């Protein structure tokens, strides 16, 4: 089930909005801003409040794509997380050394697994090369340089040199910065190709992606995909990529049919959940009897009719289950539709089956817990409590667990009469949402009633002492 994730960006992405530049430095700031549009750093500000989504099936697939690449890049061990951004434009970017952000538009527009793997390899090249840290430092230095050159230029203008002296210094710095950015992009390409070679994969997908966007460089920025603006594609860069990629012994290697099927099912699921039903039925007509097409139509059938469409949607899911009875995410889908239709009992059965087929699925475990809470019985609530605590403990995909999971945990504690633990869970929910003030209020209330020195008491003490100025 595709769910809305925590909109709060990682701590490295939280930044204050820059104030308006003064009149004297306006053009210099415009130059720096223009550079940042050409870099992945542009997304640091845009990422505030990113509409992140969570889905076990898709996250598992992307992890299978990325894990070998990250290992080859020396970034393995679960250090890097793939995060999914709900946006229909093609884009992927990094803002730190911990996360790679991929838009749903990139996932749905990529025809093959290898194309997305190539994008991930390129972004891994940026992380391994320390490009963002280097670019931040370069921008910091050159902002100072621009200011000094502008002061000197103003002096020259007063002396009779004219405004051209001011603009010339700005342009020199901008050209230098853009040259460095182009060098970083080319270096990330080459690192990405090395990672693909080390893992026995083709560079064809990366080449196809950059060829696709090369022509967009001639369009205005408003009509370009964000990926083009953050990854400038020069003709000589594509030619170099073509030369290096085609020399690999793996260039002609294709994705396996099984991996291609999983990729197509991901695209179908995203279409079903995120696009209008009419669009889905047009994209996947009834004449298409493939599993991905059936998958997309089952989702669209439910969302077109709501609870009234449940019988037809369930019938379509049951047909999918006849073809793949051990595929956990068809069972998850069955549970999702029943839960949305107020049939908690049926949802519990479906989620139990899904979890038995994928025991590490913390998201499905949370869904099962919410279905159990909907039964509103003490035994079900006690079972839900155990699932929620385990889900929070085991979820390593997000930097912080979802606020919604903590709220469900609080609900379970309240029902069982465990008010201090419930207040502690609400404090965590507010903190995960970025509402530190409310988090401190509930943390103080919880701490006053908890056993002194207990793990939860110590955690509440940490929240109370948290300094928002850090």
PLM region descriptions:
Residues 320, 353-354, 390-391, 429, ...:
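Canonical positions in the second alpha-helix
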Residues 325, 359, 396-400, 417, ...:
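Short coil turns that delineate tetratricopeptide repeat
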Residues 124-140:
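Catalytic Zn2+-binding segment of zinc metalloproteases
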Residues 304-307, 341, 375-378, 416-417, ...:
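Structural motif corresponding to the intra-repeat A-B loop/turn of tetratricopeptide repeats
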Residues 291, 328-329, 362-363, 399, ...:
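Helix-start (N-cap) detector for alpha-helical repeat units in TPR-like alpha-solenoids
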Residues 47-49, 54-56, 60, 82, ...:
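Extracytoplasmic and endomembrane cell-envelope/extracellular-matrix remodeling and assembly machinery
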